[in-house]
């Protein structure tokens, strides 16, 4: 089973991917960040430059992940991905209309990904601003990022119904470093149960 986790900037996608993958022990694919990406990408995103190149770059990152996972996906596994075709389409709204036709051509890269479930995370802007300030990335300016979030979040909400197996989840009040928060996401997304590794009081092993 392939589960994509998507949403606007600062909503907690990377954290949720890592945490759920650690619960299921079946693997995960993040989208990376500074240090993984070509160093020009962040500058171009911030300046609004090269929209087709930026979108194609992330599409190819996602495509490499989905292709690699296809060799490991089995009926009893739950593999998590940060990013989906929906991500590429939602971000088109960031760019001027003159680029939209070319950006839609890039979407074809993701036509074969077809995750079995797409979790669309949404949140209030107050929560997003708090998360962005807490992670304190040097290339991010909080007010600008909150503005980006509002725009992209609206697109995710609008587009989600057109993607099969997508579920929109408001993450406000759900802590991803808390088991109750993770269990709530699993319940809302209708994911299969994970196998708990028991903790025991031992004097000897085995």
Explain the meaning of each model-derived region.
Residues 1-2:
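Pre-Walker A (Motif I) flank of P-loop NTPase domains
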Residues 5:
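Hydrophobic anchor at the beta1->P-loop junction of P-loop NTPases
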Residues 8:
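P-loop (Walker A) phosphate-binding loop of NTP-binding proteins
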Residues 13:
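Conserved lysine of the Walker
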Residues 16, 20:
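Hydrophobic positions on the alpha1 helix immediately C-terminal to the Walker A/P-loop
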Residues 22-67:
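Conserved substrate/cofactor phosphate-moiety recognition/catalytic segment
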Residues 70-73, 79-138:
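ATP-dependent NMP and nucleoside kinases share a basic, alpha-helical "lid"
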Residues 133-139, 144-206:
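NTP-dependent small-molecule kinase module
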